[in-house]
Amino acid sequence: MGDGNLKKSKLSWPKTLVKKWLNIKSKSEDFHADDLDRGEGGGDWRNNVIEREEACSVRKSKTETRSKRNSGRARRNKLDVDPPLDHLRVFTATWNVAGKSPPSYLNLDDWLHTSPPSDIYVLGFQEIVPLNAGNVLGTEDNGPARKWVSLIRRTLNSLPGGSCQTPSPVPHPVAELDSDFEGDSAAGANSLFYHRSRSMRMDASASSLPQQFDRRFSVCDRFMLGDTPDDFYDQSFRYCSSEDEPADSPCHDHYSPVSRTGSFVADDRDKGRDKSKYCLVASKQMVGIFLTVWVKSDLRDSVNNLKVSCVGRGLMGYLGNKGSISISMSVHQTSFCFVCSHLTSGQKEGDELRRNSDVLEILRKTRFPRVNNAGDDKSPQMISEHDRVIWLGDLNYRIALSYRSAKALVEMRDWRALLEKDQLRIEQRKGCVFEGWKEGTIYFPPTYKYSNNSDIYAGDDRLPKAKRRTPAWCDRILWHGSGISQLSYVRGESRFSDHRPVYSLFSVEIESAYRNRIKKSSSYTSSRIEVEELLPQRYGYSELNPY
């Protein structure tokens, strides 16, 4: 059995390589999500969501005729109601983790615990695996992605308070985004997540702990991931690849949560846990780029038209070591698009033009094809067609100053002077990139590049092997569309990577109550239709209508 799976894995490697080199895109349905049929959030991941689409199409085919008649009755009753607006709290974050796999002791509580909890969490990562030839040209390493999902799930489902049946009310903005740069007090008020505890830092003692080994999977292999134990990182759980460890390796003495079929084995105590507060609606990995979207479990049934599109902008302009992952979805009547990107690196003059080209190509090539007979004939097909768009990631735009000049301004905390030389702001003012997009006021220091496990920028320590990089705001969050209000825009202080994570909290308008009213009214018309179908044909609806 094991030899057969190993042979299958080896055969899938050339297939993956050919797909990458010829830029053969995977199906848009290929993403991971919690099983919607399960009562709890910790359900199965699915590599292929065609089953879900087919189930939806079957249900639609059974009710399509009745729905059309119901909508006609609703129009006949003149239910012309303007769609009222509700508000959702949307937490977004981007983090370049420098190719490091998350250890078991990495605590995300301070990162994800907002007050009150958000309705939607959009978490984007870059470099979740090292960008070496094996990962770029060969099979993708899905082990770190599964670890991040397990950590995020455990953290979100430990949020204080229960899940709400209604969207969150509109909170008051933390600070006025147009206030003066010099307003340090305003900046302090705006720093909802600015002061981070040491729980997310990589202390020297923690660094000495043994590292886990990851089993590698091919992106072409179909596998189902079952319930992930909340204490996935318990010492009794350890897994490794037979190719990575010799037969007498200590890791073979531990129970492996990954079976030979590529499935997680749920712990018995995990089967009886309570319903999860949050569920994973979509996650996608492209080499080192990883994007996950989580929603409150009570909001899950309102999410529909989920689609994913990937654009590679790396080697030869096609491979996935650079590029973007975009997730399109609708919440009730409002369409969302979340874009996570890792753009071309480099601080030489002219590199910003390559980043501009990356953005334009991502906007041009990202497509969300409509599914026939799936009820999404009006769903947006391009990023710009969505009602609400949030773009996050390592955009890699630098500061057009020398290292010494930029460092001096950082020490003076003169963010205004630094932002005047920020390449992204410069290119936006020229109209070369992100025209019409918005970004909140930056009150925090540049997020790149830090020395290993320290708060010192690379180059300050003057180590002979240290690469000197001009400090820059590489990690950004922008948005496009009306009905989006930014409540905070801050960075975290984790030393886990040479980048600092960046977070933003939004209040987003959605049209939702209109659907509820139509549903309620259609329930009345549905009952009348059923009565009509049972009566002799000589009686018409107009003769029997008592309303």
UniProtKB/Swiss-Prot annotation:
Ranges annotated as biased composition (Basic and acidic residues): 56-67
GO biological process: phosphatidylinositol dephosphorylation
E.C. designation(s): 3.1.3.-
Catalytic 1 as annotated region, ranges: 387-402
A family per Pfam: Exo_endo_phos2
Region of interest: Disordered: 56-80
Keywords, comma-separated and alphabetical: Hydrolase
MF annotations from Gene Ontology: inositol-polyphosphate 5-phosphatase activity
Disulphide bonds in the chain: none
Xref: Gene3D superfamilies: Endonuclease/exonuclease/phosphatase
Domain of life: Eukaryota
Record InterPro entries: Endo/exonu/phosph_ase_sf, IP5P_plant, IPPc
Region (Catalytic 2): 467-482
PANTHER family tied to this protein: TYPE I INOSITOL POLYPHOSPHATE 5-PHOSPHATASE 4, TYPE IV INOSITOL POLYPHOSPHATE 5-PHOSPHATASE 9
Similarity field: Belongs to the inositol polyphosphate 5-phosphatase family.
The protein's name in its UniProt record: Type I inositol polyphosphate 5-phosphatase 4
Species of the source: Arabidopsis thaliana (Mouse-ear cress)
